[in-house]
Amino acid sequence: MYVSAAEGFFLISGIVLGLVRGRKLLDQPFKKSTKLILKRGLRLYIEACLLTLLFTVIGWMFANNPGLKYGIASPDTPFLAIVWNTLTLSYSYGWADFLRYYAVFLTGAPIVLWLLRRGLWYVVVVISILIWSLYPLTPGGENYIELSWQVIFYAGMIIGFYWPELTNFWRAHFSRRTRIIISRLLFASFITTAIANFILVFGALFWNIEPLKSIHYDSIDFFEKDRMTWRRLLLGTVWFWGFFVFMRRHERLITQKLGKLLTPLGTNSLYVYTIESFVVFFAHLFIAPAQPLVQILPWYINLVISITAIALVWLAVHKRFLFKIIPR
């Protein structure tokens, strides 16, 4: 897909951080917010390092398995070197690699929060864009994603910090009719581009339709994930706010019908992400190779596998499996 759910998670995380640790603690000492943020960042850093080492050791046990995730360190590598590279964040392995990005972003968050407390949001914007523009100067790859993806997280922090002003501006400067029109246009844009994206990707990778394959492979570089191109950012913005409009419009109904199913997953997001990383890791080892499933199994089997994986994660939350060990 030209935009993934990951971008939305980073944006939401930034929004929540800006609102909960920024705006709501505005009358509290800055030291309090900083301590809470850095404590969370340290926790994520420790978990990211431990999971990398654990997945590496487990991966060595399945070295000849075709479903083993790519990028694992060679078993011949001195273990102390792997530990050092893990601690310095130059090596990451497994399906929980986003934790290290969160840890890095949270480390920089107090600086952003300090600027926001002084009304210097535009300084944050300029610095963030400058850092984002540095990515093309690097060798590229996962070790430099922090440079490009931070623009999403810190944009979220700005939005969260100024959420009351933004909502007041929205209601005060746009009539109800105008708000409805804008919301519907956003949702229509989201649906239209999402369907087009689905047809292109699945037409190229699964249905093997030649014209769609040509369009897809000609377009994919414009939406490069690691670089986080401006086109991907723009499309992600449309998708996020289009989906937000839908969720806000039907929030009460969704809560009534799906609240018991979704709320436990949302309130234990770090735990869910950790458990999910193990489910995905072993699913690829014993069910089908990892990259990508849609090219190997029929769509309905993939659907069953996906639903089963989600059910396993939900069951783990429901049973509070290892709640005292795995951070939440």
Provide a role label for each language-model segment.
Residues 1-328:
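Alpha-helical transmembrane segments and their immediate juxtamembrane cytosolic regions
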